[in-house]
Amino acid sequence: GLGDVYKRQEFYLDEKAISEELRSYMEELARLTPKLTVRKSTEGAEHVPLVRVLRSDGSDSGLAFHGVPGGHEFTSFIMGLYNVAGPGQALDGETMGRIKALDAPTDMQIFVSLSCTMCPELVIAAQHIAALNPNVRAEAYDLNHFPALKETYNVMSVPCLVLNGEKVLFGKKSISQLLDTLEQQEQKSRTSDRPEG
C-alpha cells in the first residue's frame, strides 16, 4: 500500500499560526503512517512554513509545499511522496525519456489555493518531473499565505506557474503540456546562450 512508500519530511516554521497548523498536521500524518518520519528544521529557509520531501537517504528531492498541504492539495502531496519513493505513477517510455533529457537547472514555483480544483493536476505533473530529474525543482505555494509573492509575480488566478523566477504562466497543464513548456524554455536559453558570430 501507499504506507510502504512514504519518505521523510522536513518542515520549517516561523511564529505564525499557519506554522503551528503545519506542525500539528505533519505530526498527525506521521502518527498515522509509520513509514513517514518528520523532523523540524531551523536552518534558514525562505517562504515558511514549508515542508520539504526528502529521499530515504535524507537528500532533498526537489519537492516542497509552502503552507499546509490540505484541501485539494492533499492528493498532490501524497502523489509527490509516492513519486519520490518510486516507482511512482506509471509513465510511458517517451514521457520518461523527455523527463530524463531535461538538463538545464529548472525551478518551478506553482501558486495554488487549497479550494482550486484545477491546481492539483499541475502540481502533480511538476512534482512528478522533479521527482525523476535532479535538475528540476517543483515547489507549491498556498498563495493565501504569501501575498508578497502574489504581488511580485502579479498572480491574478491559480494555478500559476513561475519558471526560474521569470516566466509566468496561468492555467492547468498535463505532464505532456508541461514538458512542452520546459523543453521550449531549455531551447530558448540554449539559443540565447550561443555566442554571436
What residue spans do the PLM features occupy?
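Long, charged amphipathic helices and adjacent flexible linkers at domain junctions
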Residues: P87-L102, D193-P195
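Thiol-based oxidoreductase modules, predominantly thioredoxin-like and allied folds used
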Residues: D14, P34-A45, P134-A148
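Short, small-residue-biased leader/transition segments that mark boundaries at the very start
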Residues: G1-Y6
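Non-catalytic, surface beta->alpha helical segment in thiol-disulfide oxidoreductase systems
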Residues: R55-P87, V162-G197
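Short active-site neighborhood of thiol/selenol oxidoreductases, capturing the structured segment around
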Residues: K7-Y12, A104-L114
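Structural micro-motif
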Residues: E43-L63, P147-N164
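Typically the conserved alpha-helix immediately C-terminal to a functionally engaged Cys/Sec
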Residues: S19-A30, P120-L132
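The canonical Cys-X-X-Cys-His
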Residues: C116-C119, L161
